[in-house]
Amino acid sequence: MKKKADWMTKAKKRKVKKKDRGIVDVMMLMQHYFKELSLWFNEMTDPRHPSYTTYTQADLALMGVMKNICAVKSMRSMEENFNEQPCIDTLRILSGDRKLNEMPHSDTLNYYLEQLSPMCLADVRKKMVKSLIRRKVFYHSKLFGKYWRIIIDGTGLFYFREKHCENCLVTTITREEDGKEVRVKRYYHKVLEAKLVLAPGITVSLDTEFIENENEDVSKNDCELNAAKRLLDRLSRDYPRLPICLQGDALYAVEPIMEICRGHGWKYILTHKASRQKVLAENYAWIAGGGGAQTIKGIGKERGRGEYINHVEESAGKKEEANMYSYRYETKGAGTKELHEFQWITNIELTRKNLEEMIEAGRGRWKIENEGFNNQKNGIYEIEHLNSRNSNAMKNHYLITQIADIIMQLYLSFSPLRRGIGQSIKNTSSRLLESFRRQTVTDEDVSYITRYTTVYLE
């Protein structure tokens, strides 16, 4: 089926484009959702000597945010693209720095990020997320109208042939040289991300744990599970009253993670694989084989078959609650049939009434997880691009990208070009870059930005 935008004439598309305010709409959304953003940046502990500072922290941080929103890949490209008077004028309004008369140099930004504690930017992100959580407009996305869905997943960021820093993770790969197999070391940096589901199409960074070795003398790499324990412990302190449903792939479907969730009163929906929890898998199959599973046919988008068994942990001799459920359906091709099957573990009591919503929640994790990281890696942000070789600056660049992504997701959900003509994310960012470089923000625009506005998201 064609999308709405495919039926529009070119003339109608041009008419929709005329309604686009470009960078002014981004500024309006920042004012609407994060009115004190520049203040939050300026309240960070400034690592610079006061007598040597020309730019405020908000000047520097917001320039980094705009670099990401406008899909500018490199620091050099930012230097060239942002050297325009409208950029200076717009950044002055965003940061509130009336003395700003020139864009900061990219080296100035990198030098600042080399010294700034990543906890400072993480704290700004926390304030942004709490501001969004308080808004009732996102409540409809809670699971059963109660639990905020938090998805955790790890991804690789940077890879090096030689040791980059003392915190590098290391792996050994086999490659062929002169007809012989040679084992060589490769060094890399990895991150564990917790994403908060606010609405369809809006899944924002909630917290980040960098997976790294404490020093170069450790005998074993830091791993995702250890990082997950640190991240979940911090989430419990930062959001002590937030009703959470944790979601993750089969890597996290282990008792230590489930125990942490139970200790904090959280729910969990974790992908199940027999290779990860063999005893549970065997007991589920044994109970189902004896007719102990509840089955519902014709559910889900594909009208497939759902099945569940509560408290499999009792027969498996496990401590943590393991209510298990699955969903399977067939797709037909040219004379062939393909079976698709998914299975999850949860501590939510399963019933015939809630099974379909639980299936949609479980399947949604994969889509959100892959779209989120795929867009950041291969879309407008290209988080694997090295903006600095300094390990501290690398972390801060990553966190600035997460802050920018929160703003950008809100804009994409609001943008008339996305909603009206289905413009791609990359083209939307390109138009924002041109708007930032060419559009003069007028007094009328400032009035539009600062007055109370009802914002309708897709």
What are these language model-derived features?
Residues 174-242:
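Electropositive, glycine- and tryptophan-enriched low-complexity nucleic-acid-binding patches
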Residues 27, 32-103:
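Gly/serine-rich nucleotide phosphate-binding loop at the start of the catalytic core
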Residues 269-365:
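An anionic, glycine-rich sequence signature occurring as long contiguous blocks
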Residues 85, 297-305, 377-391, 396, ...:
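A short, flexible helix-boundary coil/loop motif
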